[in-house]
Amino acid sequence: MQFNIQEIIKMIPHSYPFLLIDKVIACTPNESTIAVKNVTFNEPFFIGHFPGNPIMPGVLIVEAMAQACMICVISNDQGQNTQDYSVYFMSIELAKFRKPVIPGDTLIIEVNVTHKRNNTCKFQCHAQVENTLVAEAQILAMIKQNEA
């Protein structure tokens, strides 16, 4: 499955300037997702990080991973309303930042469910630019059905 930005906006609660996924190029619900973030000089975080040497903050790369995880577990192919669910992140472990991400880069984020139990999922996440690993992390999340 693939999702464009209009579909993503309907799926997850994030909006500008905190929506960090531009499109999903592959998604197998509850298994894996590959998402894209086109990093431009117009991103608001580049104003202060860092003037004259813009680098995407590592915490925002992890946030992009978390948003891809959210899409992975709330997307479905059965027509259910994805807004019926919320995803809460419980932990981020083994986060490593290997190379800087700069304006003009296309960040490819791949998340894979490595363990699922009841309403929790563990993900292995990788972010690449031009087939080079720039960041990785393990994320643990809880999926909760929203009350009506």
Curated annotation (Swiss-Prot):
CDD domains with a match to the protein in the record: FabZ
Segments traversing the membrane: none
Coiled coil (residue ranges): none
Matches recorded under Pfam families: FabA
Enzyme class: lyase
Primary location recorded for the protein, binned into one broad class: cytoplasm
E.C. number: 4.2.1.59
Family of the protein in this entry: Belongs to the thioester dehydratase family. FabZ subfamily.
UniProt function note: Involved in unsaturated fatty acids biosynthesis. Catalyzes the dehydration of short chain beta-hydroxyacyl-ACPs and long chain saturated and unsaturated beta-hydroxyacyl-ACPs.
Protein name per the record: 3-hydroxyacyl-[acyl-carrier-protein] dehydratase FabZ
Organism: Ehrlichia canis (strain Jake)
